[in-house]
Curated annotation (Swiss-Prot):
UniProt binding sites for NADP(+): G192, A193, G194, S195, M196, S197
UniProt lineage: Bacteria, Bacillati, Actinomycetota, Actinomycetes, Kitasatosporales
Presence of keyword GTP-binding: no
Cross-referenced SUPFAM superfamilies: Glutamyl tRNA-reductase catalytic, N-terminal domain, Glutamyl tRNA-reductase dimerization domain, NAD(P)-binding Rossmann-fold domains
Source superkingdom: Bacteria
Function (record text): Catalyzes the NADPH-dependent reduction of glutamyl-tRNA(Glu) to glutamate 1-semialdehyde (GSA).
Site label Important for activity, positions: H99
Organism for this UniProt entry: Streptomyces avermitilis (strain ATCC 31267 / DSM 46492 / JCM 5070 / NBRC 14893 / NCIMB 12804 / NRRL 8165 / MA-4680)
Pathway: Porphyrin-containing compound metabolism; protoporphyrin-IX biosynthesis; 5-aminolevulinate from L-glutamyl-tRNA(Glu): step 1/2
Stretches the record annotates as Disordered: 546-569
Keywords: NADP, Oxidoreductase, Porphyrin biosynthesis
EC number: 1.2.1.70
Record protein name field: Glutamyl-tRNA reductase
Length: 569
C-alpha cells in the first residue's frame, strides 16, 4: 500500500484561503483525470467540502507523489502553489488511513461528531468509481471509512457531541436561547436547494418556523424541496419556492435567512441586506464603527463612546471643567462622576491609554500630589455604584452563511440590526465547544479499524503471490501426470484418477501450512517483505503474479459496477 493524501482544511488554512480554493464539480472531474494521468499515481479520489479539499492517490513514489499532487491541487483550485503550500498537510500509508477514518467519524470536522461528512465521503467514492479512477485500494479504503463512521455513530454517543453545521449555526444565531424557542413563528428564507440548504430548511421547519421560502436557480429543485417540507408529517410549516430574482423582496419579509449555494460571487451584498432591514427598527440602518478621535485634541468626546452610560458632552463644555483638582467636578455630581469612572475601569487598557496625552498624565499626577499634600494621605476610592446598561435590541434579521466561498458579504457584520454567522465565526465558536467523553471511544474505534485495514491490505498484497504459487504447483502436477501417461499408457481411468488425486493432496498438504502462515505474517506490521521472499524462494514469474493481481482488480471493478447498477434499479 502506497496511499498518499495531500489536502487543506479549516484546521490548516484560514477561511480566506479556503473560500478561494474551492473546487467545482467540473474541476473535481478534471483533477481526478489529471491525477491518474500523472506518472506517480495509479488511483485517485477527491474529497471536497466547504471546509476541506483532499486528494487521495495510490502512488509508487512518495516525494514525486507529494510534488505532483500539490501542483495539481494548486492548478485546479486556482490558488498559486507558493501561497497554497504553507497550508497543505500530507499523510502517507497508515497515517493517511487514520486521517480519513477520523474524518469519517467526524473527529476532524468543524463541529465534532457531525454526520454529514459520511454522505460527502460516499459521494467522493461514487465520483471516483464513475470516472474509473478508484481501484482496489481506494475502493477498500473509502468503503471501510464509511463502515467506520457508521460504527462510531452506532456504538458511541458521538452524536450527542456532534451537530450538523446547520444546527450549530442556528445555535450561534439564537445566542443562548433554545433554537426551538428562538425560531418559533419566524419567517425563514433559504437560498439554495442542495444538500446543506435542504438540511437547513428541514431543521428550521422542525424548529417551528411559520414559513420557509426556498430560492434556487433551478426552480424544479426549489419546488420539490418546498413540497417535501409541506407534506412532512413532523412539521406544520408553510413552504413555497421562488426564483432567485425574488430574493431581495423576500429578504425584506424574512426574520432569518440561510444561504448555501455554489455561486462564485456574493449572493447578498451589504447594500442589499441594509436595504432589506431599512426601517424595521424604526431608525435608518447604521454601521458599527469606532468613533474617530477629534482633530483638535486627539480625543473623542467623552459621551460618544460606545457603551458609555453617560453623556458628558454638556458637562465637558461647561465653564470650569478640567481634569485638575476640585475643578474636575464642577458641574457634575459625585454619583455621575463615579458612574463614568466605573465604566472607564471596565474598559480596555488600550482605550484608556489612547485617551491620555502626556499633558493629561502630567495634570493628573499634579492633582494627585496636591491632594496628598493637603490631606496628608491618598483619598479613599469609593466603590462605584453598578452601572445598568440598556440592553441592545434583538437583531431584525439573522443571517447564516454556510457557503464556501461566502455567499453573504462579510461587511454585513458591521450593520446594526443584523446578526451574521458565517463559516469563519463558526470556526471560532467551535474551537471553544466542549468535547464529549465518547470522543475517546471513537478514537479507539478508529485505531482498531486502521489496524484491521492495514492487516487486510498487507494480506491482500501477498494473495496474488500465493495464488501464483498454487497455480505453479497445479501446473507441475498436470505435467507430471501427463508424463506418467506417456510412461504407463496402460493405466485405466480409475487408476489415473487415484494417482492424480494422491499427487494433488501431497502438494496441497505441503503448501497449506506455509501459505497460511505467510498470510498471517504478511498481515502483521512490517510483513510486506514476505511476498518478495515467497517469489524468490519458488522462483515465481513476476508477470504471472501481476496477471493475478490485474484479474483481481477487474473482478473488484465489475463487482462495484454491478452494485451501482443494482442501486439504480
Amino acid at each position: 500500500m502506497s496511499l498518499l493524501v495531500v489536502g487543506l482544511s479549516h484546521r490548516s488554512a484560514p477561511v480566506s484561503v479556503l473560500e478561494r480554493a474551492t473546487l467545482t464539480a467540473d474541476a473535481q472531474v478534471k483533477l481526478l483525470q489529471d491525477t491518474v494521468a500523472a506518472e506517480p499515481a495509479t488511483e485517485a479520489a477527491v474529497l471536497a467540502t466547504c471546509n476541506r479539499i483532499e486528494l487521495y492517490a495510490d502512488v509508487d513514489k512518495f516525494h514525486a507523489g507529494v510534488a505532483e499532487l500539490s501542483t495539481l491541487l494548486a492548478q485546479h483550485s486556482g490558488v498559486g502553489l507558493e501561497e497554497l503550500t504553507p497550508y497543505l498537510y500530507v499523510h502517507y500509508e497508515d497515517r493517511a488511513v487514520h486521517h480519513l477514518f477520523s474524518v469519517a467519524c467526524g473527529l476532524d470536522s468543524m463541529v465534532v461528531g457531525e454526520g454529514q461528512i459520511l454522505g460527502q465521503i460516499k459521494d467522493a467514492l461514487a465520483t471516483a468509481q464513475e470516472l474509473h479512477t478508484a481501484g482496489r485500494l481506494l475502493n477498500d479504503l473509502f468503503q471501510q471509512a464509511l463502515r467506520t463512521g457508521k460504527r462510531a455513530h452506532s456504538e458511541t454517543g458521538i452524536d450527542r457531541a456532534g451537530q450538523s453545521l446547520v444546527t450549530f449555526g442556528l445555535e450561534q444565531l439564537s445566542a443562548g436561547t433554545a433554537v426551538e424557542a428562538w425560531a418559533k413563528g419566524k419567517r425563514a428564507l433559504v437560498i439554495g436547494a442542495g444538500s446543506m440548504s435542504s438540511l437547513a430548511a428541514a431543521t428550521l421547519a422542525r424548529a417551528g418556523v411559520a414559513e420557509v421560502v426556498i430560492a434556487n436557480r433551478t426552480p424544479d429543485r426549489a419546488e420539490r424541496l418546498a413540497q417535501i417540507l409541506t407534506e412532512g408529517d413532523d412539521t406544520d410549516v408553510l413552504a413555497r419556492a421562488v426564483p432567485m430574482d425574488a430574493v431581495p423582496a423576500e429578504l425584506t419579509r424574512a426574520d432569518v435567512a440561510v444561504s448555501c449555494t455554489g455561486a462564485t460571487g456574493l449572493v447578498l451584498t451589504a447594500e442589499a441586506v441594509a436595504a432589506a432591514v431599512e426601517g424595521r427598527t424604526g431608525t435608518p440602518v447604521a454601521v458599527r464603527e469606532e468613533t474617530p478621535a477629534s482633530a483638535a485634541g486627539g480625543l473623542a468626546p467623552a459621551g460618544t463612546d460606545e457603551g458609555c452610560p453617560l453623556d458628558l458632552s454638556a458637562v465637558q463644555g461647561a465653564t470650569g471643567f478640567s481634569v485638575m483638582g476640585e475643578a474636575a467636578v464642577a458641574g457634575m455630581d459625585a454619583a455621575t462622576l463615579e458612574q463614568h469612572a466605573a465604566w472607564v475601569d471596565r474598559g480596555t487598557v488600550d482605550r484608556r491609554d489612547s485617551r491620555r496625552t502626556p499633558e493629561v498624565e502630567a495634570e493628573l499626577i499634579t492633582a494627585l500630589a496636591a491632594t496628598v499634600a493637603a490631606g496628608g494621605r491618598l483619598p479613599e476610592r469609593r466603590r462605584p455604584e453598578p452601572v445598568v446598561e440598556a440592553p441592545r435590541p434583538a437583531p431584525a434579521l439573522a443571517l447564516l452563511d454556510l457557503a464556501m466561498p461566502r455567499d453573504i458579504d462579510a461587511a454585513v457584520h458591521r450593520l446594526l440590526g443584523v446578526r451574521l454567522v458565517d463559516i469563519e465565526s463558526l470556526a471560532e465558536a467551535s474551537a471553544d465547544a466542549p468535547m464529549a467523553a465518547d470522543v475517546d471511544l471513537v478514537r479507539r474505534i478508529v485505531a482498531d479499524e486502521v489496524a484491521a485495514f492495514g492487516a487486510a491490505q498487507r494480506a491482500a498484497h501477498i494473495t496474488p503471490t500465493v495464488v501464483a504459487l498454487r497455480t505453479m504447483a497445479a501446473d507441475v502436477v498436470a505435467n507430471e501426470i501427463a508424463r506418467l501417461d506417456g510412461r504407463l499408457p496402460g493405466l485405466d481411468e480409475k487408476q489415473r484418477g487415484e494417482i492424480t488425486q494422491t499427487v494433488r493432496r501431497v502438494v496441497d498438504k505441503l503448501l497449506h501450512a506455509p501459505t497460511v502462515r505467510v498470510k498471517q505474517l504478511a498481515a502483521e506490521p512490517g510483513g510486506a517483505g514476505y511476498a518478495d521472499a515467497l517469489r524468490t524462494l519458488f522462483d515465481l514469474d513476476p508477470e504471472t503474479v501481476a496477471a493475478v493481481s490485474r484479474a483481481d482488480d477487474r473482478d473488484t471493478s465489475d463487482s462495484t459496477e454491478n452494485a451501482k447498477n443494482r442501486g439504480r434499479e
